[in-house]
Design a protein with these regions (language model features):
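Conserved phosphate- and dinucleotide-binding cores of soluble alpha/beta proteins
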Residues: 1-127
Length: 127
């Protein structure tokens, strides 16, 4: 009988006293940022992540709102090549939605830039 998906990471993270997730800040020699505004699939939701660690630093996300979490992750974990892009997205998305900042027009622009140009740094957000 399967209790959770393959590996059980969801149950493991949800039941952890302090869940810590690690990732490199970039992939493919810097062409892809691991920190992005939105993803098409998640294994662990925002409610399961307490601490995020990259080689850039540590983001303690406990007790923070979605906007505060985004700021903490950008400031502490995003690669310097992508920080300004992520700040730009956050600025565009705040005020357009209620509790969770999101711009549907721009949410996947970084992914689209990579698909079209091979480099997420070529992202152009729309106002």
């Amino acid at each position: 009988k399967i209790m959770n998906g393959i590996g059980g990471s969801g149950d493991f993270a949800r039941n952890a006293y302090l869940s810590i997730f690690t990732t490199p800040s970039v992939a493919k020699d810097g062409l892809i940022s691991s920190i992005v505004p939105q993803v098409s699939h998640v294994d662990s939701t925002e409610h399961d992540v307490r601490i995020l660690v990259t080689e850039q630093g540590v983001a303690d996300l406990r007790g923070k709102s979605p906007s505060q979490r985004a700021r903490c992750i950008i400031e502490n974990c995003a690669h310097p090549d992508y920080k300004q892009l992520l700040w730009d997205y956050l600025k565009l998305s705040e005020g357009k939605s209620c509790h969770t900042p999101m711009s549907l027009r721009n949410a996947f622009k970084m992914h689209i830039a990579y698909a079209e140009t091979g480099d997420m740094r070529n992202t152009q957000f729309e106002s």
